A protein has these predicted regions:
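Bacterial N-terminal signal peptides
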Residues: 8-16
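Acidic, histidine-bearing metal-coordination/catalytic regions of metal-dependent phosphoesterases
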Residues: 19-147, 392-418
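Acidic/histidine-rich helix-loop elements
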Residues: 60-98, 139-159, 229-237, 264-268, ...
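Extended active-site neighborhood of metal-dependent phosphoesterases/phosphodiesterases
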Residues: 96-105, 113-127, 131, 189-277, ...
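An acidic-aromatic substrate-binding cleft motif
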Residues: 99, 123-178, 183-184
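Active-site neighborhood of phospho(di)ester-bond hydrolases with catalytic His/Asp-centered motifs
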Residues: 140-143, 174-180, 184, 205-211, ...
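Core catalytic region of metal-dependent phosphoesterases/phosphodiesterases
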Residues: 155-216, 316
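Active-site-proximal segments of metal-dependent phosphoesterases and phosphodiesterases across multiple
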Residues: 262, 268, 283-324, 342, ...
Length: 418
């Protein structure tokens, strides 16, 4: 009897140790290519912790009676290991980051439906929502909060911005980010800390790789793999950009997500633009939205930036809305076609988000360029916090800029052209 009790005790102890080791971290829900029926999850577990399982069901399944489970695909990730970084108290250190990357695509889901899930032995319940089949949905659009554990207030400012919009407008269907959500993308501890915030546990996220997300401290290493390994985006990009550049359909809207860091050269730009043309040709949609990190215009003066590189393609392909960031100043046009403003029946609305970290904003300066194109500029100076709401119907997309208190600063409507 004593031997049986001892064996039972050891078995329970071993199970407890395994369960503890399998608690996931850096968990995020990303969109699937068809966001109405597919979700893609990404999380990390410790080396040697064994297989990892996600259990999910409808959000209103109170007792988890109809739970389903799926095992993750696993691979060792070492891209962040030994990278020079900083601790939350500002001390220099090298990241100790070797872990198992777990990825999972869940398909055959019900459109427009809220689900809940948990992973392994973790008692944290997280949520995601599939896109509707019609075009009635809402998203918040945010960028440039440069999460940096020694200055936690940056992340707090951005998360509070999301909370303010949530309180005023109700829960959104997804969060779109336009890059630079991390100060140094190579600092794994920054990603891990950021993903512990509530919006990462209750929303689906879709974003683009920013220059800060792409770099380690001091630009010692620059790679899109920091972004790729902390997300599980659709693998429908082009060579070298799988899981970084991608596209997805949300309702009746086609989103195309770009990586500026691969488009510095003429050949890199041509490669990206060839892919964009193919995606648009093969994925007919009511609205077409393109997102990249670098700004269309320099908001402080109005001078052209990426607008000059993309306007011809957008005109030819019928892009409805172009969203960018990076400049930390909000700027917005009405619909533009062939370099002039239209009545909205054709052309692209260009918009770029302000920063949201209350620390790294830019002040407006004399408006010297593109006064006939840019309709609105906004900044609070160095301490700027703002974000957009994007509301969709079958007839239009409505973009609204909000300040940190939720006040509406600017609004634009993108008309349906198809």
């Amino acid at each position: 009897m004593k031997n049986c009790r001892y064996i039972l005790f050891v078995a329970i102890f071993v199970v407890a140790i395994i369960a503890q080791a399998q608690v996931p971290y850096t968990v995020i829900a990303n969109v699937g290519e068809d966001a109405s029926t597919t979700i893609r999850l990404n999380w990390h577990t410790d080396e040697g912790s064994g297989e990892s399982v996600c259990r999910y069901t409808l959000a209103d399944d109170v007792n988890w009676e109809y739970v389903k489970e799926a095992k993750a695909r696993q691979e060792l990730c070492t891209i962040f290991d030994s990278i020079y970084s900083k601790t939350p108290d500002g001390k220099d250190f090298y990241e100790d980051a070797r872990f198992i990357r777990n990825t999972l695509e869940i398909s055959s889901l019900t459109p427009g439906t809220q689900y809940k899930y948990y992973i392994d032995g973790d008692n944290t319940v997280r949520y995601f929502k599939t896109a509707p089949t019609n075009n009635n949905w809402t998203a918040t659009v945010i960028s440039d909060f440069h999460a940096y554990t020694p200055i936690a207030s940056r992340t707090s400012a951005a998360m509070n911005m999301l909370s303010t919009l949530e309180q005023q407008r109700g829960e959104f269907d997804m969060v779109l980010h336009v890059g630079d959500i991390i100060a140094w993308g190579g600092s794994y501890s920054f990603w891990k800390s950021l993903y512990e915030n509530s919006p990462f546990k209750k929303y689906v996220w879709a974003g683009v790789n920013g220059n800060h997300d792409n770099m380690s401290r001091g630009y010692a290493l620059q790679t899109n793999q920091f972004f790729a390994n902390t997300n599980n985006n659709p693998l429908n990009g082009y060579d070298g950009e799988m899981g970084v550049c991608y596209h997805f359909t949300y309702g009746n809207t086609l989103f195309i997500m770009l990586n500026n860091e691969s488009m510095a050269s003429a050949s890199g730009l041509n490669k990206a633009q060839k892919w964009v043309r193919e995606v648009i040709a093969n994925n007919p949609a009511r609205f077409i939205v393109v997102m990249e990190h670098y700004q269309w215009f320099y908001g402080e003066s109005g001078k052209s930036s990426q607008y000059d590189r993309w306007k011809t393609l957008f005109d030819e392909c019928g892009v409805d809305l172009a969203i960018a960031a990076n400049n930390h100043i909000y700027a917005r046009t009405n619909a533009l076609y062939d370099g002039v403003e239209t009545d909205g029946a054709r052309g692209t609305v260009y918009v770029q988000t302000p920063s949201s970290d209350n620390e790294r904003g830019q002040a407006l300066k004399e408006w010297t360029d593109n006064k006939s194109l840019i309709k609105s500029r906004w900044s609070e100076g160095g301490k700027t916090v703002g974000a957009l709401m994007l509301n969709a119907t079958n007839e239009n997309l409505t973009i609204t800029l909000h300040d940190r208190n939720g006040n509406v600063i600017d609004t634009a409507v993108v008309k349906c052209k198809r």
